[in-house]
Amino acid sequence: MNKFKNYIFDWSGTLVDDLGPVLDSTNRVFNYYGKDSFTRDEFCSEFCLPFKNFYDKFLPEVPMSELELLYTKFFNQSDENVFLLPGAKEILCECRNLGFKTYLLSSIKKQHFENQSAELGVSDFFDFAYTEALDKRDWITMLLKDNNISHEETLFIGDMQHDIETARHAGVFSVGVLTGYNSKEMIEVSQPDLIVNDLVELLDIIVNKS
């Protein structure tokens, strides 16, 4: 792991647990169109990125622009909380201490990220945050180019199959973390370079191999 100098993190399910407000908001969108709510397990088994693939399956008749507006409205109204996942702040601190560059690449709304990261005390840890990346494969190459970083020295940490596919698309090392939306079985199908239970385990690997 000591060859990696650039750490790209996903947000939802990787650094934070935001499943509460995400599920609440999604269910309110579905209810608005007369659809049944998802249970937590149902949502995790069905949800996928890019968002369009998920909504095309269940609400193909509704324009994405309309869905995004409704989702944002309901998310802002949700009483559900967002929490830092175990090891999140610690791994960001260690990356800073070791002189590594840290980036965010997430589909989260820019304002939601700014609010959540400030409230959770981690907004200052990122060299740059790329938000509203609806298809991360389209964004990761731009991230590498913008910051003049080598894919050989870069890894991407995420909790979903789309994150692993994004890393592979850019030729960077992929880390699947099992604290988020996709199950271990789903992550294994994507064949990441490394699977960890949580960021505490990844931090231990970084500390012992740096």
Language model features with spans:
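Conserved phosphate-coupling serine/threonine residues in phosphotransfer and NTP-handling enzymes
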Residues: 14, 106-108
